[in-house]
Swiss-Prot record:
Source species, domain of life: Eukaryota
Family from the record: Belongs to the peptidase S10 family.
Protein name from the UniProt record: Serine carboxypeptidase-like 2
UniProt gene name: SCPL2
Glycosylation, residue list: N109, N350, N382
Keywords, alphabetical: Carboxypeptidase, Disulfide bond, Glycoprotein, Hydrolase, Protease, Secreted, Signal
Active-site residues per Swiss-Prot or TrEMBL entry: S184, D366, H419
Amino acid sequence: MANKYFSSVLKSLLLLLHLVFLSKQHVDSASIVKFLPGFEGPLPFELETGYIGIGEEEEVQLFYYFIKSERNPKEDPLILWLTGGPGCSSISGLLFENGPLTMKLDVYNGTLPSLVSTTYSWTKTSSMIFLDQPVGTGFSYSRTQQFNKPSDSGEAKRIHEFLQKWLGKHQEFSSNPFYVAGDSYSGLVVPATVQEISKGNYECCNPPINLQGYVLGNPLTDYAIDSNSRIPFAHGMALISDELYESLKKTCKGEYTNVHPRNTQCLKFIEEFNKCTNRILQQLILDPLCETETPDCYIYRYLLTTYWANDATVREALQINKESIGEWVRCYRTIPYDNDIKSSMPYHVNNSISGYRSLIYSGDHDLEVPYLGTQAWIRSLNYSIIDDWRPWMIKNQIAGYTRTYANKMTFATIKGGGHTIEFKPEEASIMFQRWINGQPL
């Protein structure tokens, strides 16, 4: 009887140890993915997916997609891509903006949506990490309920920790030139992350990261400057009349966001402005505002991606932990989060003093974060201009306009572009390749 009891206890202990081992094995796990459901044949590039544990107990598990450069991964730059939101999966970058795959826009018929290769991937000349952050975004999750609520400044620290651990497990990339990139809301997080990495390079006891600079597209940078640029932008794009614009300027005096409740005249004209623009697609004012998700609407790809990412065979191929999350959503709009950085301009200044390169680009038909606001905050930094406003060309056609500053900052517009580069991926790719290779746009 005693032997039976001892045997039972021993089996239970062994099972417990096995489960603990599996749990520890999953932390910082990584898998090479050679085939993806929906894509015909083997992948024509090297894809790795995995989790990196963050925090003292590694309670936060951040999921990433890593794609090696198709040119020379031993020497090419390493780019960390952060999608905006906060709470939007980095799959938005991978499948819609600058990755080697995208969704095939077929009408959904109940079967798994298809993936096809792109011609504009940034991985042609750079290795890229697409990171799902903050926790709760994409396939990233927490193993417990005990973790600090994500915030802008907190994410800069978590991302830095992620990079230290990731590079510790991928030491062959530790000497590659490293850049942080992102768009939209990442305009607040990326500059803070760059500063955090820079500071960490001078502290004990981790190897320094070969940080060279950062890239930002239509970046939310300063709430006041960016939001107050929408009305001048709308006027310049003929969305509102001269008379309404003059009335807005006169009564609101440049403050269109935090209007005093007693300023009824300003509020009245802002209501008129909203009536003129509420049926405009803010991300790209040239495109129709879709009523339904149909294949001719740009958001249809988001629907297809949701079906794809929630398919069991896809999750198995990506090696997603079954206990991580329930339904995958592209953007977790109600994610618990503290927006504690109201302006990232001080971070830009500090990063500039530290000598880092930066490329700031704007799709010039974005009403959400208009290029006028981006130009305004760059202008307020009072950097000397070394290459003044000029067109940049693709095949003898104007693709946008650019200006270069003495602090290694390059600003560029993408003609006809929107809030993200999914609207002009080919042009954005050429712009990026020139900049990352040290060539003038």
